[in-house]
Amino acid sequence: MIEETQKYYDSLEGGKVIAIDFDNTVCLDEWPEVGPLFEDAVKVLKELVKNGHKLIPYTQRSKRYPICCPELKQFLKDHPEKQYLTPLGFGQGRVDILTDAINIFKDNGIEVFDINRNLKWEQTTGDDSRKLFADYFIDDHNVGMQYKIIINKNGEKCKACDWNFIDDWFVKEGLYKNKVL
């Protein structure tokens, strides 16, 4: 395990692992739909990848999310192709609300290292703590984060990540090779 850990850190070549939440962090929260992407997020995430850092989207979204609320039932009416049927007796089915979210990274030229999970070698220990390993976490629920107030699809005010603040913070942390404030 120590050798695997060292190989992993060597593969980063000085880069950091950055975990990024999805709804109201990278895009407007229109769960279970994928809301519009924040353009400032695209700029910052591309800059991080360009500087050798690894991005891991982490989110409650899943490929087999239980159909458990009116929003998901409506989502399935609009997108029946997203449903996965489960064996008889195991609930009313599941829905994929992760794939479109991850594709938004790919469609915008943002390379992701992994999705919603720890390093592959950690899984061999049999211990799934569900706590993702990362050097930094970007989430609209972070303590100490500067936010901006936005209006969601229902016309309600909600907070979202301020990517200009995040960009400046990463500059101060020295995560960009050639960028200064």
Please annotate each region the language model reported.
Residues 1-118:
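Alpha-helical substrate-recognition element adjacent to the catalytic core
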